[in-house]
Each structure stands twice: as structure tokens, then as C-alpha cells.
A protein has these predicted regions:
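A polyanion-binding, active-site-adjacent surface
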Residues: 3, 15-163, 167-170, 175, ...
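Generic N-terminal amphipathic, Lys/Arg-enriched alpha-helix
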Residues: 1-13
């Protein structure tokens, strides 16, 4: 089926778009958008892919679900629109970057700047009904985003996969650790940040790996 997404991804993922589950998923998502607020806005569902073409990916950060409150989600995991207060997990991410790299906490929680540098900010589920966390889980998005991870694993070398929390860590089973760096820790949520997220040094480790593999480090 026809999906509006960056051409480099379209070429890689067309077989997924043509599978029956994806049509069922698309029908469900269209129905949801027609009945009330769903996040992110429909035009931004594939924002992570559009900002970060397949051959430009250097780092993959895996989230679970889009934010479900108004104005927050814009298709990049953990990121919020300009001018929106930082959700707790994002605040903790910026704290870790500050502690790890000595960078000041930014004024904006919009991580588009990371995506443009090759950081794929991938939620496992790409849509959510307003106010209902997890409401679009188990509808097919996970099958689709797993195929994205497998495609990156097989089609690229020397990537960094950052997996926070038990949900994301399970995705590590699809990644060849002989060819890619896999960084795992607790989730940045306030419930777990002090149990292994703070002090994980993932941002400096990712940059060290990229430099060692001839890539430009990310300006986190």
C-alpha cells in the first residue's frame, strides 16, 4: 500500500507495507483519528524516519509509546514540541547528558536536532489515543517497528542501539552485537532513573564508538 515516508525507508520497508497486518493496522489508525484526538498529528507519524534517512542513521534510541497529552508528541521518542515543559523522563535524559558530557540543559525539549544528526528516535508504537497511554499497543505497530530494527541490523554496520528499560532491552535480541554497539540500562523514568540510568554514560560511550568507526560524534 502507499505510505508517505522518506524514500530511503520506503524502499526498505515496502514489503512490510504490503503485508496484511499493515493494512489492518492502517485501517485501525485511520478509524481512531476519525473519532477523536490521536497523537502525534497524522502527518508526523513517520517523522522519525523523515528526519533521519536509512543511510544516515548512526544511533537508534528505542521508546515505547508516544506522549498522550496535548501538544507533546511529534513522532520522535522522548521528544516534545518547542515550548512544551519537559516530561520527567526527558528531564532525566538531559540531566544525564549534563553529568556525562558537561553540557548545559537545553531550553527546548525538541530533539529534532538529534534526528538531523542521525539519531533515529523510534517508538515501538507510533500512535496513541489522547489521554490513554498504551491504547494502540498490540495493533501491529510493534511488528512494523521490529522490522525496522531488523532492517537496520542487517543493512547497516557500526550502529549504536540505546535500550532503556526492560521493554526496550527485549529488542536487543534482534541486534548482532558483533557488528553494532548495544547500550542497555534502566529507564530514565523517575521510577527507575536512580536504579541504573543515571551514571550510565551512554551519550559519551555512543560518541566514542562513532569516532572510533570514523563517524562524527552527536552534539547531544
Amino acid at each position: 500500500m502507499e505510505v508517505r515516508i522518506d524514500p530511503s525507508w520506503k524502499e526498505r520497508l515496502q514489503t512490510e507495507f504490503d503485508k496484511p497486518y499493515f493494512k489492518t493496522l492502517t485501517d485501525f489508525v485511520r478509524e481512531e483519528y476519525s473519532h477523536g484526538p490521536v497523537y502525534p498529528p497524522a502527518r508526523l507519524i513517520f517523522n522519525a524516519f523523515d528526519l533521519c534517512p536509512f543511510d544516515k542513521v548512526k544511533v537508534v534510541i528505542i521508546g515505547q509509546d508516544p506522549y498522550h497529552e496535548p501538544g507533546q508528541a511529534h513522532g520522535l521518542c522522548f521528544s516534545v514540541n518547542e515550548g512544551i515543559p519537559f516530561p520527567p523522563s526527558l528531564r532525566n535524559i538531559f540531566k544525564e547528558i549534563s553529568d556525562d558530557l558537561g553540557k548545559p540543559v537545553p531550553v527546548s525539549g525538541d530533539l529534532t536536532r538529534w534526528a538531523r544528526q542521525g539519531v533515529l528516535l523510534l517508538n515501538a508504537t507510533l500512535t496513541v489515543r489522547a489521554g490513554l497511554a498504551g491504547s494502540h499497543q498490540g495493533r501491529g505497530w510493534e511488528e512494523f517497528t521490529d522490522s525496522v530494527i531488523r532492517e537496520l541490523n542487517a543493512g547497516r554496520d557500526g550502529l549504536v542501539f540505546i535500550l532503556w528499560g526492560s521493554y526496550a532491552k527485549k529488542k536487543g535480541a534482534m541486534i548482532d552485537r558483533n557488528r553494532h554497539l548495544v547500550l542497555c540500562s534502566a529507564h530514565p523514568s523517575p521510577l527507575s532513573a536512580y536504579n541504573g540510568f543515571f551514571g550510565n554514560h551512554h551519550f559519551s560511550q555512543a560518541n566514542d564508538w562513532l569516532v572510533a568507526h570514523g563517524e562524527k560524534p552527536v552534539d547531544w
